[in-house]
Design a protein with these regions (language model features):
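Gram-negative outer-membrane beta-barrel transporters
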Residues: 1-128
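Residues that define the transmembrane beta-barrel architecture of outer-membrane proteins
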Residues: 28-32, 97-101, 141-145, 158, ...
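Generic long, charged, amphipathic alpha-helical segments
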Residues: 118, 127-145
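Short, low-complexity, polar/charged sequence segments that are solvent-exposed and flexible
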Residues: 69-72, 133-136, 181-185
Length: 203
């Protein structure tokens, strides 16, 4: 009644929302992926090494007709300079670092194995936080190291692997960013040092 008295229609439950996705134009991505894999059998056991690296050299979102119109409006002052983003040169902006790598080393002797691995990335920038000088906020490089130990045995005709491990060995926090979680949740893991036990039985 209060809505009608104010000349407004009462609101109710939203039954349908239409939000059409528009692919504004092409995105160009260039870079190099490299991988090094090496296994070595020795008198004391087997060593396995792996190193994978992804290096981006270009990540560019083309304007297209719609974005060009909006860009011209920003340059003329009709729209604020921060009205739209996510186009032009977006290399290392809001994710997609120039360099990401994964490195692991594993040693196995008989029924026992030890392993260590590391994930790392280079600096990325976010355009939601701009300094007075016009510079984007730099989200510093981040890397985490994990270690584990495996034991293999047979159980009722099946192969059992028992793993005890520690993730984020150095107990590092993800770098600060102005996202809803306080860090780039799509890029970094903010889980502190944690221990786990994993059992895998294969028949």
């Amino acid at each position: 009644a209060s809505f009608l008295a104010a000349g407004l229609c009462p609101f109710g439950l939203a039954e349908r929302v239409e939000d059409s996705y528009a692919n504004l134009n092409d995105r160009s991505v260039e870079g190099t992926d490299l991988g090094v894999y090496y296994d070595m059998d020795t008198a004391i056991g087997k060593f396995s090494f792996k190193h994978q690296v992804s290096m981006l050299t270009k990540r560019e979102q083309q304007y297209g007709e719609t974005l060009s119109t909006l860009d011209n409006a920003m340059q003329s002052g009709f729209l604020p300079l921060t009205a739209i983003d996510g186009f032009g040169d977006i290399l290392a902006v809001n994710g997609s670092p120039k360099r990401k790598s994964y490195t692991s080393l594993r040693f196995r002797r008989g029924d026992w194995a030890l392993g260590i691995n590391q994930n790392a990335r280079s600096t990325v920038y976010e355009d939601r936080t701009i300094s007075a000088a016009g510079s984007m906020w730099a989200v510093t490089p981040f890397k985490t190291m994990n270690v584990y130990s495996d034991y293999y045995t047979n159980v009722n005709g099946g192969d059992l692997r028992l793993r005890v491990g520690v993730n984020n060995w150095h107990d590092r926090r993800a770098p600060l960013a102005s996202s809803r979680m306080g860090y780039f949740e799509d890029l970094d893991n903010n889980l502190r040092r944690n221990f786990y036990l994993d059992l895998r039985l294969t028949y």
